[in-house]
Every structure is written in C-alpha cells, then in structure tokens.
C-alpha cells in the first residue's frame, strides 16, 4: 500500500536473479506505481535505474499487463539501451547423442540451428544447463506473445515435431 504523506512511496520495482546467459541479468518480478502517479514515466524511470545506473541486463517478467507491455516497449527510447527478443531451446532440440547411430537426429539438430540463425535471424547469446539462448531484433511494440507466435510459426512450418521453446524480451545497457 502507498501511504498518503510527504515522501511516500509512489512506485516499486522488484527484480530477482534469473538464469540467463548474460552475466548479472535480473528479471522483473513485479512493478507497481500508485494510481495517482501513473502515466508520468515512473515505471520507465525504475527500469532505467536497473539498466543505466546499476548496468544490469533486465529480462521481462513471464506475464505483463497492457500497461506493463507499454512500459517495456518504452525502454528502447532510453538512449544507450537496446531491447531484444530471445528464444530458449532445450538442448535436445540442438544436440545429438554421440552414441546414437540414427543420423536423423543429427540432421534435425542442424536444421533447427539453420532455421534459428539463418531464417529467423537469431544470434547465439549463450547457454544455461539444458538450454541454449538466441537473441532476435524486435520492434519496440513486440510483445512476448507475438514473438512466441512468430518463432513457433516458423519452426512448425519446417518440423512436424515441435521444439521445446520459450521466448521473452530483455534489455541491456550498451552505453551508445
């Protein structure tokens, strides 16, 4: 709750450490702004503190309100901040078992990498145990659901077996 007194709290951003291949990344857990102060850029300023002052990569939370999506989109307007989409794929979709004699698995893994990097324009950004991450350029208005639909649609056109993917958005300080 927000108190109604001088110096009262008008906004709060709660972030938590997240398993992400970019060192120091934090994920938005919750952001809230007092109703009387909404529309004044407070949420964007809170995100900006994490990115420009703390210089921590910021990963979007798993769910967003319409207002949260607008705030997230506004991050690309902060000078020196770059916003990207990412897809996380299970290693089983990109690796083959060296002891597996079936060459179809190796071919499928190579095709998945070709689609992600070639046809979808993904850039490999790293891995966490069991997962590989690829970044994508996105428009500032792109939502996680739109990115998921785009990735799923392109992968499903080529493969009958669905890959195990998760998509999201992240922002980093580039200082440029």
Regions found by a protein language model. Give the residues of each.
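Conserved acetyl-CoA-binding loop-helix of GNAT-fold acetyltransferases
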Residues: 33-52
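Terminal substrate-recognition subdomain of acyl/acetyltransferases
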Residues: 5-22, 52-176
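Conserved acetyl-CoA binding element of GNAT-fold acetyltransferases
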Residues: 23-35
């Amino acid at each position: 709750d927000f108190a109604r007194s001088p110096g009262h709290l008008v906004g709060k951003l709660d972030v938590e450490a997240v398993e992400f291949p970019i060192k120091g990344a934090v994920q938005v857990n919750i952001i809230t702004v007092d109703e009387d102060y909404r529309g004044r850029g407070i949420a964007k300023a809170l995100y900006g503190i994490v990115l420009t002052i703390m210089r921590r990569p910021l990963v979007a939370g798993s769910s967003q309100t319409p207002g949260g999506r607008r705030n997230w989109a506004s991050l690309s307007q902060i000078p020196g901040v770059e916003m990207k989409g990412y897809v996380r794929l299970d290693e089983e979709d990109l690796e083959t078992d060296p002891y597996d004699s079936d060459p179809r698995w190796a071919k499928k893994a190579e095709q998945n990498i070709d689609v992600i990097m070639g046809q979808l324009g993904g850039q490999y950004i790293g891995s966490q145990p069991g997962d590989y991450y690829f970044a994508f350029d996105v428009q500032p208005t792109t939502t996680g659901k739109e990115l998921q639909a785009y990735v799923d649609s392109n992968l499903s056109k080529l493969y009958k077996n669905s890959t195990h993917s998760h998509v999201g958005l992240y922002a980093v300080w580039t200082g440029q």
